[in-house]
Amino acid sequence: MKKYIILHLSLILLVFIACTDDQKQDDKNITFQRSDFKVRKSLSGKTIEFDSLILRPSQIQLFDSFLVTCNQGAEKQFHIFNLNTAHKEGECTPVGQGPKEMMTPCFVNRNDSVVIFDMMTSTIFTYSSPEFTSGKEPEYASRISLDTKPLWSNIRSLGNGFLGVSYQETSPGFLFDQTGKKTMDFGTYPKTEQEYTPAELINAFRADLTTNRKEKVAITHYFTDLICIYNVNGTLEKQLRGPDHFASVFKEFRDGDIIGRKASPQTYRDAFYSPVYVGNSLFGLYNGKMVT
């Protein structure tokens, strides 16, 4: 197992800052091509060799000069490394459902504190950065439970509340207030010429989301190259379609008593992953290849 990590981002392919004049667009619908990205940037980084093993983290996050890796399934899931000294400060948060334990943790997009969402228990934990990166078992500053359980989604901060993907037919997202109460169904599913059952629709538009924490929300889709931009009230502002203009088609099937959904092999393609807002820019990983 390696002790080093390369701080190098080579897979960020798309940056959405503004729409160029040659893009086809109306008030809400914008199409773009690969050729619309006029500038190609090469990102470079350096290798930091730590004094302890780096496992195989499912997530990493920076808090000031500390790198925190999330290692789901490890005895203690968060490992804290000091970037300045290359020293491992410690580990924290055992697997479990106790007051200081988590089952399936995910980082929430905050930089003023450490906020972590446990999907399995639909619980949001907030810590001060110094407390969480001390190398000891941290004491949380707040712990709230969402009233929708379980919520198998990344959670993002939006205003004074939290937003997650719903995986329900009513809307693509759920908005929660700072107490964990669901306050609204957020957004609407895109219109499609394909006739879908509710379950097929949810699978066709499986999504991830990100926010700028204030007033903008971007919902990106795993199996269609479509990005939907909403305001804080859940009103659709723009749809960005491209660069390849495709949509994977899903169909229900029955196997005995089991009803499932699967994509048509002729249309099954990967689209967007891991969206992140940085200031007024939206970064996203894009694939575009057929799923085999």
Predicted regions and their residues:
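C-terminal motif of bacterial Sec signal peptides marking the signal peptidase cleavage site
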Residues: 15-18
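A short helix->beta-strand "capping" segment at the edge of beta-propeller domains
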Residues: 29-55
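Beta-strand-rich domains and repeat architectures in extracellular enzymes and scaffolds
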Residues: 46-77, 273-274, 281-290
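Structural signature of eukaryotic scaffold interfaces centered on beta-propeller domains
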Residues: 56-61, 105-110, 152-158, 200-214, ...
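Short loop/turn segments that connect beta-strands within beta-propeller blades
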Residues: 83-85, 129-132, 177-181, 231-235
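Blade-loop segments of beta-propeller domains
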Residues: 87-121, 142-146
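Asp-box/WD-like beta-propeller blade repeats and closely related beta-sheet repeat scaffolds
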Residues: 120-122, 128-159
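Flexible internal linker/loop segments at domain or repeat junctions
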Residues: 237-275
